[in-house]
UniProtKB/Swiss-Prot annotation:
GO annotation, biological process: cell division; cell wall organization; peptidoglycan biosynthetic process; regulation of cell shape; UDP-N-acetylgalactosamine biosynthetic process
GO cellular component, one term: cytoplasm
The protein's name in its UniProt record: UDP-N-acetylglucosamine 1-carboxyvinyltransferase
Family to which this protein belongs: Belongs to the EPSP synthase family. MurA subfamily.
NCBIfam families in UniProt: murA, PRK09369.1
Protein's gene: murA
GO molecular function, one term: UDP-N-acetylglucosamine 1-carboxyvinyltransferase activity
Entry annotation: catalytic residues: 116
UniProt KW rRNA-binding keyword: no
Residues holding UDP-N-acetyl-alpha-D-glucosamine: 92, 121-125, 161-164, 306, 328
Function: Cell wall formation. Adds enolpyruvyl to UDP-N-acetylglucosamine.
Family matches, as CDD domains: UdpNAET
EC number(s) stated in the UniProt entry for this protein: 2.5.1.7
Amino acid sequence: MEKFRVIGSTQPLMGEVTISGAKNAALPILFASILAEEPVEVANVPHLRDIDTTMELLKRLGAKVERNGSVHVDPSSIDEYCAPYDLVKTMRASIWALGPLVARFGQGQVSLPGGCAIGARPVDLHITGLEQLGATITLEDGYVKAHVDGRLQGAHIVMDKVSVGATITIMCAATLAEGTTVLDNAAREPEIVDTAKFLNTLGAKISGAGTDTITIEGVERLGGGKHAVVADRIETGTFLVAAAVSGGKVVCHNTQAHLLEAVLAKLEEAGALVETGEDWISVDMTGRELKAVNIRTAPHPGFPTDMQAQFTLLNMMAKGGGVITETIFENRFMHVPELKRMGAKAEIEGNTVICGDVERLSAAQVMATDLRASASLVIAGCIAKGETIVDRIYHIDRGYDKIENKLNALGAKIERFRESN
């Protein structure tokens, strides 16, 4: 199993980094390509394990898939309608295959998905939405099976709770439904907006993405097209926090400030100098004092839960005491005990973590527990005294494109190695 060896330093992280395309947009876009009857080209797709798994799944379904810079998908040859357990057991996003399959082919089945173990993320909302569009759903032998005679039917759907995943499932399926679908209490994340842009490029008629009401006028077919995936706002935020906690200055390119306004506001509150341009963001912490901030995670445009672990680390290194409240997922403070192994001061009380400040962390052997928490451990290792070993880094590879290379280019000392038995 691969690990990171991180040599800590008091030297600030300095330099420039190019941000990859958003995993959370690239995945639904690749799954949405199932809806098309002609070839599609998707640019700015990150090099990640989940992307590779998705491309392999599309091939298993019969699509022609190749990557040469962009990802090219020809879904016209799809003739299988099952996403099998051996492929999807590690990836929760696989549920996104179900809506496009039943919408285009009248049938589909997906093995109940895996992914990060950060609380209950049930597929109930996906299933309910597809049922409201007219699909018959059954759970058999660990598979979610969907079927419809003829086309799905447009409907007025009010979501019980805001869900990014279910919003994408319903929006994708409704593109080929007969009639108009109105989706209320929809999630508003930029990745949903990007998925809608992709579908509209293929001929869909979607309006309102980015608001809490999305309207989809069903069309009979989708054609081909080209699309570039939006920047990864979480990767952007991760590198900006790395600059802040190390007392450095980092410029992130190929990203946009409007994607993470809540994060930038908190970085400014923490004492950082934040500057932005059309396609870049910089954080300068040189000679400035890091101050703790209070954070409450919330659906977009609120503070993203995927930045919570990074700001937990920031609060541990900042002056004063900061309180972080997690409202999206339970069981998402698994990074806190690992950071405490490095000397951090923090107490978990229900869905909040209260951080005290420490002068400097000490190296330790720590274990990555989920995708975003893993990044906070790597950054902690960069600023700790001594040599930190981060175990189970396959979590990181699921969401960050060459994170060690990008951090090393800023002055970090991170080595990927495989421990021999």
